[in-house]
Curated annotation (Swiss-Prot):
Organism: Homo sapiens (Human)
Assigned GO CC terms: centrosome; ciliary base; cytoplasm; midbody
Record field: compositional bias (Basic and acidic residues): 730-744
Subcellular location: Midbody; Cytoplasm, Cytoskeleton, Microtubule organizing center, Centrosome; Cytoplasm, Cytoskeleton, Cilium basal body
Keywords: Cell projection, Cilium biogenesis/degradation, Coiled coil, Cytoplasm, Cytoskeleton
Record-given protein name: Centrosomal protein of 126 kDa
Function statement: Participates in cytokinesis. Necessary for microtubules and mitotic spindle organization. Involved in primary cilium formation.
Pfam families given in the database record: K1377
Tissue-level expression: Expressed in brain, lung, skeletal muscle, kidney, pancreas, testis and ovary.
Biased segments, Basic residues type: 745-758
Binding partners and assembly: Interacts with DCTN1.
GO BP terms, alphabetized: cilium assembly; cytoplasmic microtubule organization; mitotic spindle organization; non-motile cilium assembly
Length: 1117
């Protein structure tokens, strides 16, 4: 069997030989030793051993084959695992690399966005490039995976039970058998497919999770955005409501949108007036009804939402407001007399006013309300004009009440509005609103007249009456008890308008009464009358042709309580300051709209609207810049808000007649205007004697508007009045009753009360004015028939003497017109009265008619003009010792106001007068104050008669010097502002002529004037020029020319005085001053030639002048 194999044969042979040798040897030994030999047993053993060896060899070979197969399997498995591990590592590295790239890309994109935002921060949002969020483009492998995922979406969308389940354990257990049976390539493909499926499933799950998360995030973001938008809308709505209820001016909600304020409760039609006449137009009710909607044709006016808001606030409590009367019903009544007030301004005014006020009166005892519906009508210039207005006025002999009814289309707030009237050919129109009703009720109850309380409750009064030249002139007729009526005043500083602490003092302010506030110049003149006797009433009855309708009013205390309760009940929140101050306004009184001076009505768009009462929003180039407030060192703590600045428009002058204007005093900074009414008090003699003299000349002279005014102010527009440095004491303020009955006034003369004394004279001669203050009375008679005219101030009595005037020498020269003013700065701002003209705390601008001093010259009234010097009471004792002099000059209008330490305030203004009208002023000592006024008058008259001869020669000398100075100044620089200013200074210095018996007062007065005009006036002139938007170069040239011109002043002033009366020391001082002035003139010329040293040397002349003055004062002492 094994013979065929060589290996076996050799093995067996070797084994057989070996065994045979061994066998042979083994038995040979015994055989040799004598044993027996057996050959058969030897062969059998040999065969048996070979068989066993062959079996063992086969087993070993089989085991070797199995081990080789196992090693091969393990090797393959190890190689597969290595490859799988390598692939996984590569995939992880790729994933990490992709993640890194993605993060870096995001960071790079964010960095680019931030840099772009930073670089384009100056570019507006509309022009910026919007960053578009673009999805990153996936690489090719990810795109293939996404395609495979999209193919397997059907499998993913199947339910979980129907999905093909893969038993991974069975696959792993079957792997060894499969590997042993199948080829290596088949195994590799199977494993790759399984891994691919695993990854795809994992990716699908991840994408589902991420898509769910993204969807949830987007949903949450949209919800948050919607919530934020809703909240923002709610917040905006709440802010608008709060702005409506809490705004300082209820009708200025769209204050930044100036175009929406063309109509605010009064339609105003701009018409250029080429004539001076202000005529009263009387229309029939049919004509009124035919034009009642004409206002809506102007600029397509529509009632703004401010009107609806105010109407809503007005109608919060319908039970406390009067029933709405249909406008047609009111017009259809027989007792309604509609009259139209036609307001035209002069040609210089760009915004004339056409206001329509309908008046309804009843002759019976029933109180028919006056219906005022300005928004409904526009008066056309072509309407009928009447020359007589006395025939159109009806009176209510017993009682009447004015109220403002709601118009036809929209309901405007109720408002106590007085009738406004104008006389034919009158140059000033008047609109008045009634002040506090309680004082009327007190007056009515004292006089026993019937009073009817009204339940009209004005919640807000956005009535706006911007007027150009208007004033209120209520007058008396028959036995009607006339009450004191103040005009509507304009004030932006309403925190000053506080009620007085005493019940007697009823201030007319916006806290107590809802009033239209006028920011334009609004001319006021009042003739309040309180007749006491039958004779006075009879004389008043004689002048009934000029009297106007006046009704009695009784608004008792329940009116104020009712307003307060309505506001508290309806939850109206009251005004607070935008400047985060404490609210100084009482509850229950809302304020009206403040309209800036540049607010234009009618066909013009609104140029600017005052956004707030305390915070002014300037819009447009025509609005003046913020006026800097001068703070004097002797101001008390609460007097910062009283820097007066008068703004009034220039009136057209007729052939010979001067027309009055309102004197405005500006309070605080930011063009805050407090229009100050002229002063008048209940006096029976005033109306009686006044109307006796002018009742026949109203229509012929065309000056009825001015005839009724006891006090007129010739103060031009832009006239700046310096701030008073002397405050009134609190005790005096608290003791001054504003309105009092004439009977109680006789028994209890009040300090600080203003009285009017009028004497019968010609129609153009104004009556005298007495204002009693702390230490005496300021008496300014304005009668041509009286020469004993004197003005008393603290320590001085200034008497203007009549100049000799000739009608042939009249030219358009310059005249100085002076207004009397009293200190307006009390210590307590709550006691400031801006709407009361019956108090010494109030500025009382009085117009002095310049045709008074005619007795010597006996020239016609039209040509008779003179100069007056007004003296203002001196400072109180606690601040008069260290008060600095000050002045505020407005050069653009040719006016000047100079206040001195010796308590004399000179307000000068130029107007066409006679060339030779140069009055002389005689100063009286303070000892004459102890003499009673009725004794002092004749004495002054007698002294004036004695001093007449000596003043004539002096006047001639001064006239010659003044002419020479004016001619020299005109030759040098006739058109410059500085020239006009120096001319004013020269004329002003020459106008103050002093008697030869008081040489010390002469030199002292002129030195003070010169002091004021040097330092402070330069600063004020520069400030005015800056405010007028003059370039810096022109300002510097004006200042230099003014300083050069002022060098001539000492020479001019030394010529004015009688040198013989001066002592030798004074003559030396004057000579030294002349030398110094020449040196200063040389320095000024050098500075003008070398502008580089202008800034360093410009202060030197002022310092040198001050040093010279101080040295001269020391030498005098």
């Amino acid at each position: 069997m094994l013979a065929g194999r060589p290996g076996t044969r050799s093995a067996v042979g070797e084994l057989g030989t070996e065994s045979s040798d061994n066998l042979d040897r083994a038995p040979l030994g015994p055989r040799e030793s004598g044993g027996h030999h057996r050959p058969g047993s030897y062969l059998d053993m040999k065969i048996h051993l070979e068989k066993n060896l062959e079996e063992e060899r086969q087993i070993l070979l089989q085991q070797q084959k199995i081990c080789r197969n196992r090693a091969r399997k393990y090797f393959v498995e190890s190689n597969r695992r290595k490859k799988a591990f390598e692939e996984k590592r590569k995939e992880q590295e790729e994933k990490e690399h992709q993640i890194r790239e993605q993060i870096l890309q995001q960071r790079k994109q964010k960095f680019e966005e931030v840099t772009e935002k930073f670089q384009r921060a100056h570019v507006p949002l509309s022009q910026r490039r919007k960053a578009v969020s673009r999805k990153p483009v996936p690489p090719l492998e990810e795109a293939l995976k996404q395609i495979q995922e999209s193919n397997l979406k059907s499998e993913v969308n199947l339910p979980f039970s129907r999905r093909p389940t893969i038993n991974w354990r069975a696959i792993d257990s079957a792997l060894p058998s499969a590997l042993s049976k199948n080829d290596h390539k088949h195994q590799k493909q199977l494993l790759s497919k399984i891994n691919c499926e695993k990854e795809m499933n994992e990716n699908m799950r991840a994408t589902l999770a991420t898509s769910k998360n993204v969807f949830q995030l987007k949903l949450e973001e949209t919800q948050k955005l919607l919530e934020d938008q809703h909240l923002s809308n709610l917040q905006k709505f709440c802010d608008e409501v709060n702005q409506i209820t809490n705004s300082e001016t209820l009708s200025s909600i769209d204050s930044l949108e100036a175009t929406e304020h063309e109509e605010i409760y009064l339609t105003l039609n701009k018409e250029h007036s080429t004539s001076i006449q202000r005529n009263t137009i009387s229309l029939k009710p049919a004509n009124m009804q035919s034009t009642n909607l004409s206002c809506f044709d102007e600029d397509k006016l529509a009632f703004s939402k401010t009107q609806h808001i105010n109407n809503w606030l007005t109608n919060l409590d319908a039970s406390n407001t009067q029933n709405v009367t249909a406008f047609s019903d009111i017009l259809s009544k027989s007792n309604v007399l509609p009259s139209w007030e036609y307001f035209n301004s002069k040609e210089q005014n760009p915004s004339p006013l056409n206001g329509t006020v309908e008046r309804a009166t009843n002759t019976a005892n029933n109180s028919v309300p006056f219906v005022s519906s300005p928004p409904m009508f526009v008066l056309d210039k072509k309407c009928e004009k009447t020359s007589e207005t006395s025939t159109m006025r009806t009176t209510d002999s017993t009682s009447g009440a004015f109220k403002r009814e709601r118009p036809l289309v929209t309901e405007s707030p109720t408002f106590k509005f007085s009738k406004s009237q104008s006389t034919s050919d009158s140059l000033t129109q008047e609109v008045a609103t009634f002040p506090d009703q309680e004082k009327y009720s007190e007056l009515n109850q004292e006089n026993g007249t019937t009073s009817i309380p009204t339940s009209c409750v004005p919640v807000a009064t956005p009535l706006v009456l911007p007027s150009n030249i208007q004033s209120a002139r209520p007058s008396a007729k028959n036995s009607i008890h006339i009450k004191e009526i103040d005009a509507v005043q304009c004030s932006d500083k309403l925190d000053e308008l506080k009620d007085g602490k005493e019940e007697e003092i009823k201030y007319f302010n916006c806290n107590k009464e809802e009033l239209p506030l006028f920011s334009d110049s609004f001319q006021d003149a009042y003739i309040p009358h309180n007749p006491d006797s039958k004779d006075e009433k009879q004389k008043l009855a004689e002048t009934s042709s000029l009297s106007n309708v006046t009704s009695n009013y009784d608004f008792v205390g329940q009116h104020k309580k009712m307003k307060y309760n309505i506001h508290e009940r309806n939850g109206v929140r009251f005004l607070k300051s935008i400047l985060k101050k404490e609210s100084k306004y009482e509850h229950g009184y809302l304020k009206a709209l403040i309209i800036n001076q540049s607010f234009k009505f009618g066909n013009q768009k609104a140029a600017a609207i005052r956004d707030s009462i305390e915070l002014t929003k300037e819009k447009g180039a025509e609005i003046p810049k913020t006026i800097k407030k001068l703070r004097w060192f002797d101001e008390t703590s609460n007097i910062e808000n009283n820097a007066e600045n008068s703004h009034s428009l220039k009136n057209k002058t007729g052939t010979t007649q001067q027309h009055s204007q309102q004197f405005h005093i500006q309070s605080g900074a930011g063009s805050n205007i407090i229009s100050v009414s002229t002063c008048a008090v209940n006096s029976a003699d005033t109306k009686k004697s006044r109307e006796d003299s002018i009742s026949e000349n109203v229509t012929t002279l065309g000056g009825s508007g001015a005839d009724h005014m006891p006090l007129n102010c010739f103060i031009p527009s832009g006239y700046n009045f310096a701030k008073h440095a002397w405050p009134a004491s609190k005790k005096e303020e608290s003791k001054i009753p504003v309105h009092d009955d004439s009977k109680t006034k006789q028994g209890k003369p009040q300090r600080g009360r203003a009285k009017i004394i009028r004497k019968p004279g010609s129609a153009k001669v104004q009556s005298g004015f007495i204002c009693t203050n702390r230490k005496g009375a300021v008496i300014q008679p304005q009668s041509a028939s009286k020469v004993n005219i004197f003005t008393q101030a603290q320590g001085k009595l200034i008497i203007p003497c009549p100049p000799p005037q000739s009608t042939s020498n009249i030219r358009s020269g310059k005249n100085i017109q002076v207004s009397q003013c009293q200190p307006v700065t009390p210590e307590n701002p709550q006691n400031i009265i801006t709407h009361n003209s019956f108090n010494s705390k109030h500025v009382l601008p009085t117009e002095h008619s310049l045709n008074q001093w005619n007795q010597e010259s006996s020239s016609p009234l039209s040509n008779a003009c003179s100069d007056l010097v007004t003296v203002i009471p001196s400072l109180p004792s606690y601040c008069s010792s260290e008060c600095q002099t000050f002045a505020k000059i407005n050069h653009s209008n040719g006016t000047q106001a100079v206040a001195r330490q010796d308590a004399t305030l000179y307000c000068t203004q130029r107007s066409p007068v006679c060339e030779e009208s140069y009055p002389s002023v005689t100063l009286r000592t303070a000892e004459e104050e102890s003499v009673p006024l009725w004794k002092r008058g004749p004495n002054v008259l007698h002294q004036n008669k004695r001093a007449t001869g000596s003043t004539v020669m002096r006047r001639k000398r001064i006239a010659e010097t003044k002419r020479r100075n004016i001619l020299e100044q005109k030759r040098q620089n006739p058109g410059s502002v500085g020239q006009k200013y120096s001319e004013q200074i020269n004329n002003f210095g020459q106008s103050v002529l002093l008697s030869s018996s008081e040489p010390k007062q002469t030199t002292r007065g002129t030195s003070y004037i010169e002091e004021v005009s040097d330092s402070t006036s330069e600063f004020l002139m520069a400030e005015n020029l800056v405010k007028a938007s003059v370039p810096e170069d022109e300002i510097l040239t004006v200042l230099n020319s003014k300083q050069i011109q002022k060098s001539n002043l000492p020479l001019n002033k030394t010529q004015q005085f009688n040198i013989c009366t001066l002592s030798a020391e004074e003559q030396k001082i004057l000579e030294s001053l002349n030398d110094l002035s020449e040196r200063l003139h040389y320095i000024q010329e050098s500075i003008c030639k070398n502008p580089s040293i202008k800034n360093t040397l410009q202060i030197i002349p002022l310092l040198e002048k001050r040093e010279d003055r101080t040295s001269s004062c020391r030498d005098k002492r």
